[in-house]
Regions:
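A charged N-terminal "starter" segment
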Residues: 1-161, 194-200, 232-236, 402-422
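Active-site loop/helix belt of alpha/beta enzymes
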Residues: 2-9, 17, 169-303, 392-394
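Conserved active-site and cofactor/substrate-binding residues in soluble primary-metabolism enzymes
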Residues: 53-60, 80, 84, 146, ...
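Conserved, mostly hydrophobic/aromatic
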Residues: 58, 78, 101, 131, ...
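Short beta-strand segments
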Residues: 76, 143, 162-168, 206-208, ...
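Active-site-proximal loop/turn and secondary-structure-junction residues that shape catalytic pockets
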Residues: 79-81, 103, 122-124, 144-146, ...
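Short glycine-rich, flexible loops that bind phosphorylated cofactors or substrates
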Residues: 149, 172, 384
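Charged (often Lys/Glu-rich) extended helix/loop segments that serve as interaction or gating elements
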Residues: 264, 279-422
């Protein structure tokens, strides 16, 4: 169960099958637990798509980062705000959260003892004021002088601000480059660092190497850019926030080992012109929760050409597959399935009437897959739940907890046994 006993408004709306847990207080929810997806579909035979959480996987990922990253670990709240995964992260020791909106900070602020970072570089005046005065948030990101002025004005010239200047860095080998919308470069960056230093209690630099970055040299290149800005601006920097970008494993994406990323980050940080007490912060999202949730869908129809029509799609949890081309691992969930049956490539169509509701794949499944079968789509814990809509009236899910292992894991060095009955 969720260790701090909260359920957000969004999660309550998603729990049509949740049952109140009479053994606990505060309105918590007892989700149905199953050993495997096969056990779940055999018992429930769901008509709705099912989000299958594996909180133990989120906890393991959090412990790995806390034990191996040479600094502070803050979770990127936008990746997945499921109450079950947040509980696992919090229970494993994640006590800092990167939020990007008033709604996110309102939800995250209900968690006891957490520290929030408002790292969206462009915020409304209302959001800045709410964050500072109502939620005691001191930490803000920015990438323009105009945003700096907004922060100064809306905090009434506060003297306790932690200001992080977002600089642009190369997005090498990232699946989703992020350097175009946010980030300042060149002399403008150096001028902004100087101006922010004049009003900040703590000055930081932040960057993002891009989402699903598969090679660690991207961080080395980013640190080199940051080093140039610090030297040319001639400022003392109190913190460096390297953002997220840490990868997960997918069918079409096999990244370098996480330990290789950590070694590059350690070596790069050692070369930075900063004091010994300079804070180093990371904000993983995908790497913490991707393995911790999967989606179980039902096949509504099979058409010639290995086309499967399923009950969720691009307007739901499969946005990244449809629009960014991610190929997630899949497996057929059917009692008595022959494990040696040959696999064939399939493409998916979602349930809406829109023709762009299409996931090209290829998704490798047994040749006999048919209407009425269930398919588990794995490693969907990052952004799938967050991207869902109610287009065409779809977007309703069942939530369950599974106690088996995810299809892929990048935490192979963690041999910690799973407490299946916890």
């Amino acid at each position: 169960m969720h260790p701090f006993n909260i359920v957000s408004r969004a999660d309550i709306a998603r729990l049509p099958r949740a049952k109140p847990d009479s053994a606990s207080s505060g309105g918590s929810f007892a989700m149905e637990k199953f050993a495997t997806a096969l056990e779940m579909v055999t018992e429930m035979k769901p008509d709705l798509p099912v989000f299958a959480a594996r909180p133990h996987a989120a906890g393991r990922a959090a412990r790995w980062f806390i034990n191996n990253f040479p600094g502070e670990v803050a979770y990127a709240y936008k990746a997945n705000s499921s109450v079950f995964l947040l509980g696992a992260l919090y229970g494993a020791g994640i006590k800092q959260f990167d939020v990007a909106s008033v709604a996110e900070l309102e939800d995250a602020a209900t968690i006891p003892g957490v520290r929030l970072h408002f790292m969206h570089p462009v915020k409304s005046r209302y959001a800045i004021r709410r964050a500072y005065f109502d939620y005691d948030i001191k930490c803000f990101a920015l990438d323009t002088e105009d945003e700096l002025q907004k922060i100064i004005e809306e905090t009434d010239g506060a003297k306790d601000l932690e200001l992080f200047v977002r600089v642009s860095v190369p997005a090498k080998n990232s699946r989703v480059p992020l350097e175009h919308k946010f980030g300042i470069s060149g002399q403008k960056a150096q001028r902004l660092l100087v101006k922010a230093r004049q009003v900040a209690d703590e000055l930081g630099i932040t960057f993002h190497v891009g989402s699903q970055t598969t090679t660690p040299d991207a961080y080395a290149m980013a640190f080199e850019e940051v080093k140039k800005h610090i030297v040319k601006a001639g400022v003392v920097v109190d913190a460096i926030d390297i953002g997220g970008g840490f990868p997960s494993r997918y069918t079409d994406s096999v990244p370098a080992r996480l330990s290789d990323f950590i070694e590059v980050i350690k070596a790069s940080m050692a070369k930075m012109p900063v004091t010994e007490d300079c804070r180093l912060i990371c904000e993983p999202g995908r790497a913490l929760v991707a393995e911790a949730e999967s989606l179980i869908v039902k096949v509504d129809l099979r058409k010639p050409g290995n086309q499967l029509f399923i009950n969720d799609g691009s307007y739901g949890a499969l946005f990244d597959s449809a629009h960014l081309g991610f190929v997630f691992p899949v497996r057929l969930i059917r009692p008595g399935l022959d494990p040696n049956e040959p696999l064939e490539p399939f493409e998916f169509w979602g349930p809406t009437c829109d023709s762009i509701d299409h996931m090209k794949g290829p998704f490798m499944l047994p040749a006999s897959v048919r209407e009425g079968d269930y398919i588990e789509i794995g490693n969907l814990g990052a952004y799938a739940r967050a991207m869902g809509t109610r287009f065409n009236g779809y977007g309703e899910y069942i939530d369950v907890i599974l106690q088996d292992e995810p299809m892929y894991s990048i935490y192979t060095e963690d041999l910690e046994p799973i407490a299946r009955n916890a």
